[in-house]
Regions:
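PLP-dependent amino-acid enzyme catalytic core
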Residues: 1-332
Length: 332
């Protein structure tokens, strides 16, 4: 039985968010690929968030957040600038939105971050700073810089980010036949919380299943414990879900509305990247394939069903792509 959660926005707010996002790009496709159905033994609808202008779902949240906060920060009614931390897609999202609304954006990334994602953030206009050994360290540095430079710190999880991201869940759930289960990647939680909220807003019986990396299990541990559990490391090639300090509000919503959290290995995620390329002719980044990895882990229980997976992004580096397509799993 599906457990309902408190929906953080109204239908009217979701419609307005969809209108705003629609000023920048149209709905992304959702397709039921026949080769993928043959491979899984179920009807599988893929939500192609790799088809947004930034190649990932987070641009939706960036647009809604920036539009809502562009007049928040100073006495003269203008934002001095936004700052945040990212492994890539959140930063591209804010850089894209900042350019759209005329707001300067500073992004902090950890050392060793994807060169291609760094280049994309700079191309969208971000002032990029490299600091810290991982995402959490970069986030702490961004918070300090926000105070030092009088910038508005954009969190990785916020109700307005969830509202923006919910526009893709709305497209999927209204555009596909009713799904038994939707598998969603979980980093800081905006995607899974958005799917839970839209499912409940539409009164559907779809299970929402979050997928995380075995080597970044903080959300899975938090879900099992019923409260936030941090980890010391999140060393996974699936960089978009490399979270070691979950957001408390996100965990509360996930506990209230998700059916379960599935942990997958880097090796299974690499298999999922290759399978998506072979069956859909799309190339996901690892976090864009991790939802399929979750489905692969539960393939036996989904036989003959109708499921959705979120291909959350396609921003993969060339060297990583070459290694995965050669049949390997990149080392971290």
């Amino acid at each position: 039985m599906v457990v309902r959660s408190a929906v953080p926005f109204t239908v009217a707010e979701l419609d307005r968010a969809a209108e705003l996002v629609g000023q920048f790009f149209g709905p992304t496709p959702q397709y039921a690929w026949p080769l993928l159905a043959e491979a899984i033994g179920a009807e599988v609808w893929v939500k192609h968030e790799n088809h947004t202008p930034t190649g990932a779902f987070k641009v939706r949240g960036g647009l809604v957040y920036t539009q809502r906060h562009v007049h928040d920060s100073t006495a003269d009614g203008t934002v001095r600038g936004l700052i945040s931390a990212t492994r890539g897609n959140h930063g591209q999202s804010l850089a894209y939105a900042g350019r759209a609304f005329g707001v300067p954006v500073t992004i902090v990334v950890p050392h060793g971050n994807s060169p291609d994602k760094n280049a994309a953030m700079r191309a969208f206009g971000a002032d990029l700073i490299e600091e810290g050994r991982d995402f959490q360290a970069a986030r702490e540095h961004a918070g300090a810089l926000a105070v030092e430079r009088d910038l508005q710190m954009v969190p990785s999880f916020h109700p307005d980010l969830v509202l923006g991201v919910a526009t893709y869940a709305r497209e999927l759930m209204l555009g596909a036949p009713e799904l038994d289960t939707v598998y969603v990647p979980v980093g800081m939680g905006s995607g899974v919380c958005a799917n839970i909220a839209v499912r409940d807003l539409l009164g559907l019986d779809t299970e929402i299943v979050g997928v995380v990396a075995e080597r970044a299990p903080a959300t899975a541990l938090s879900f099992a414990a019923g409260h936030v559990v941090n980890t010391d490391t999140a060393d996974t090639m699936i960089d978009g879900v490399a979270c070691r300090a979950p957001d408390a509000a996100a965990i509360e919503a996930i506990i209230a509305g998700a059916a379960r959290i599935v942990q997958v290995s880097d090796e299974l995620c690499a298999d999922a990247v290759r399978m998506l390329f072979a069956t859909t002719h799309n190339m996901p980044e690892p976090s864009g394939a991790v939802a399929l990895a979750g489905l692969l882990a539960e393939r036996d229980q989904q036989q003959g069903g109708r499921v959705g997976i979120v291909m959350s992004g396609g921003n993969i580096d060339g060297p990583m792509l070459a290694e995965i397509m050669a049949g390997n799993t990149p080392a971290v």
